[in-house]
Amino acid sequence: LSLHDALPIYNGWNLIDSVELCIQLKALGVDLIDVSSGGAIHNAKIDAKPGFQVPFATAIRTEANIPTAAVGLITEPEQAEHIITTGEADAVFLARAMLRNPRWALMASEKLGHRIDWALPLDRGRTA
């Protein structure tokens, strides 16, 4: 869900609209909202920096009382873990980080000290 269109001068789609929509979506059985924002219109004003869309996921999670997934320049394992453990969102969706590094999940597990138990036939592929 694009939470807002980043065009405040046009009085476009905003957080209040998104909260109302998410309440209705939850009533219809939607389980989780993937929260994004703006960027679809060429003159949108977006201050893109690491985690810049996480507060939007937190707002929807709190105001609409529905699980959310955070997105938006989430690139480091510690950053992703912080978002989950602090309750800012229920999930973290990674796109560009995993396109750049298809082994991102393995790198994150090693960096955060989490052990992944591999099936024996696949274990050699883990480090090959």
Report each predicted region and the residues it spans.
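Flavin-dependent oxidoreductase catalytic cores
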Residues: L3-A128
